[in-house]
């Protein structure tokens, strides 16, 4: 926690969440904004994401909670994205318990994966009165084929909503989306504009059009000083009622060494500390203990039918039923000892599968 020293009394507070920076919450990128905010009088809580930083299996520079590790939470029905939302909601519980914090003046911000955390937690937890995702907003459609972390993937998301609808859940609270002109396609200005266009009518329905802003910077993937200064101005307007939302110059800051910011400088953590693999195993035990134990054949047949239906719909995405298929012959040719026929099989409309039949 970063606690201002300029007097007593309750003050606005910011939850700072990190993206995939080498040192997680203590990396210079998130550390810089926390210092700027506390110098401007905000209480700041910076947290490590589950499986990253000091919550990694082996805390070190460059720890990563994605790939197979992050996907290991899916079989127990708790995607990493959902765990991060819950984590951040509990962080708000802690912040509001602090005597320095005004629980009616809370915000969340972060860049990259931290921007996605900001968008998602900001959509779900209405205690955040200002939400600022940075270098993260695009479209779920653009995620297809992109190298995103599993912590940013909403399973079955496109079957329910696009990213614009998630942004719209923030309304009528204040939302500033920050993008960079030289970012990846999935986080690009053009993709973000599509989502903001979907969200804007909802803000206007709530008489909150002025609470939605898109700020674009000539930059790569970052949370740069100009971006931070835009964030300071937006928070001043919507948390403190000061100014018109224009950027506020960053006070002079001096970055501290990474080791001075660690909770466990020697990497010795309490025995009660839960790592991701242990969490998944514990969840699996609890859920398996609730699995049905049929005691006769008829009950098993009923359970089996229910299980197959749930697996098909919730896990396998559903299978086509009653779909017409057809075969279109293409060419025939004869060799010395064989005959070949090429054809196109359509197992579903619009899905051609070429094939060759060889007769000897």
Where are these regions (language model features)?
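Flexible loop/turn segments at secondary-structure boundaries
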Residues: 22-24, 52-56, 115-118, 138-143, ...
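Mobile cap/lid helix-loop segments that gate and shape the active-site cleft of serine hydrolases
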Residues: 74-75, 83, 128-172, 180-196, ...
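Glycine-rich His-Gly loop
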Residues: 5, 16-22, 180, 347
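Primarily recognizes the serine-hydrolase "nucleophile elbow" in alpha/beta-hydrolase
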Residues: 21, 40, 90-161
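Alpha/beta-hydrolase-fold catalytic nucleophile elbow
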Residues: 48, 109, 134-135, 178, ...
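Loop/turn elements at helix/coil->beta-strand transitions in domains of secreted/extracellular proteins
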Residues: 10-13, 40-43, 102-105, 126-130, ...
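Alpha/beta-hydrolase-fold serine-hydrolase catalytic core, especially in secreted/extracellular enzymes
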Residues: 9, 171, 178-354, 358-360
């Amino acid at each position: 926690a970063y606690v201002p020293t300029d007097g007593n009394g309750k003050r606005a507070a910011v939850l700072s969440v990190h993206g995939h920076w080498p040192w997680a919450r203590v990396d210079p990128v998130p550390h810089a904004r926390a210092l700027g905010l506390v110098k401007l009088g905000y209480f700041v809580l910076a947290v490590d994401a589950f499986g990253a930083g000091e919550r990694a299996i082996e805390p070190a520079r460059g720890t990563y909670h994605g790939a197979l590790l992050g996907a290991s939470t899916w079989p127990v029905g708790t995607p990493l994205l959902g765990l991060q939302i819950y984590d951040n909601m509990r962080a708000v519980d802690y912040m509001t318990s602090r005597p320095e914090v005004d629980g009616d003046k809370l915000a969340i911000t972060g860049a990259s994966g931290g921007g996605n955390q900001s968008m998602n937690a900001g959509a779900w937890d209405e205690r955040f009165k200002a939400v600022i995702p940075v270098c993260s907003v695009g479209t779920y459609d653009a995620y297809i084929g992109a190298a995103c972390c599993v912590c940013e993937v909403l399973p079955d998301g496109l079957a329910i909503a696009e990213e614009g609808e998630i942004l719209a859940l923030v309304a009528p609270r204040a939302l500033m989306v920050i993008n960079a002109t030289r970012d990846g396609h999935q986080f690009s200005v053009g993709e973000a504009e599509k989502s903001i266009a979907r969200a804007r009518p909802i803000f206007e329905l709530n008489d909150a059009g002025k609470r939605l802003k898109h700020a674009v910077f000539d930059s790569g993937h970052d949370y740069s000083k100009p971006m931070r200064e835009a964030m300071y101005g937006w928070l001043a307007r919507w948390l403190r009622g000061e100014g018109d939302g224009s950027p506020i110059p960053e006070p002079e800051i001096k970055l501290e060494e990474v080791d001075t910011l660690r909770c466990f400088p020697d990497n010795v953590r309490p025995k009660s500390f839960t790592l991701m693999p242990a969490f998944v195993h514990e969840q699996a035990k609890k859920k398996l203990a609730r699995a049905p134990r049929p005691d006769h054949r008829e009950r098993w047949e009923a359970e089996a039918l229910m299980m197959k239906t749930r697996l098909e719909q919730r896990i396998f995405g559903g299978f086509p039923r009653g779909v017409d298929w057809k075969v279109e012959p293409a060419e025939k040719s004869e060799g010395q000892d064989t005959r070949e026929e090429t054809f196109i099989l359509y197992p579903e409309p619009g899905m051609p599968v070429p094939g060759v039949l060889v007769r000897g």
